[in-house]
Amino acid sequence: MFRRATSTFLSRASATRRFSTDVATPATNSSFVEAWRKVSPNIDPPKTPLEFLKTRPPVPSTIPTKLTVNFVLPYSSQLAAKEVDSVIIPATTGEMGVLPGHVATIAELKPGVLTVQEGTDTTKYFVSSGFRFIHANSVADIIAVEAVPVNQLDRDLVQKGLQEFTQKLNSATTDLEKREAQIGIDVDSALNSALTG
């Protein structure tokens, strides 16, 4: 009995919608709209999830020559659809170089230097944290909580902050104070290595 029910259900499900991006999905379910109009003719039917779906961007058949980068902060956009040669991104799993045609991935950013290579020009940003999304169509979306061009960092302030957080860590009595001081040390150490390296 169960076997018959599942085979009937699966045959109906596969007949209604296939797993393919080439097949267009119907915008609305016509039987649902007809049933809705019978029950409440004066109210427009609600939008169904199928109406909110967008088609996937096409995956190119050849590897593109450029990587499109969107680098966004909560208050501004550093790079919007900028075509570059490569990007080196600091992630919690390690630094990752991204070239055109890279496999689709998602990762969390860690404090470090984001390097954007465009021809012979190299631009470096210090990012505090965030996420990066690499799409199959050679688009990289980088969302950072805070980012500063490395050439705008003040070496003296970084050294002062590193000393201050080291003192706070040594004098901390609670776990919260220790963790806050450790985060400050991690960020200032990454800032210091960005300036020296």
From Swiss-Prot:
GO terms for molecular function: hydrolase activity; proton-transporting ATP synthase activity, rotational mechanism. It comes from the Eukaryota. Transmembrane segments: none annotated. Signal peptide: none annotated. One of its GO terms (cellular component) is mitochondrial inner membrane. Residues 1-19 form a transit peptide. SUPFAM superfamilies: Epsilon subunit of F1F0-ATP synthase N-terminal domain (SSF51344). The keyword Ion transport applies. Keywords: ATP synthesis, CF(1), Hydrogen ion transport, Hydrolase, Ion transport, Membrane, Mitochondrion, Mitochondrion inner membrane, Transit peptide, Transport. It is found in: Mitochondrion; Mitochondrion inner membrane. Mitochondrial membrane ATP synthase (F(1)F(0) ATP synthase or Complex V) produces ATP from ADP in the presence of a proton gradient across the membrane which is generated by electron transport complexes of the respiratory chain. F-type ATPases consist of two structural domains, F(1) - containing the extramembraneous catalytic core, and F(0) - containing the membrane proton channel, linked together by a central stalk and a peripheral stalk. During catalysis, ATP turnover in the catalytic domain of F(1) is coupled via a rotary mechanism of the central stalk subunits to proton translocation. Belongs to the ATPase epsilon chain family. This is ATP synthase subunit delta', mitochondrial. The lineage of its organism: Eukaryota, Viridiplantae, Streptophyta, Embryophyta, Tracheophyta.
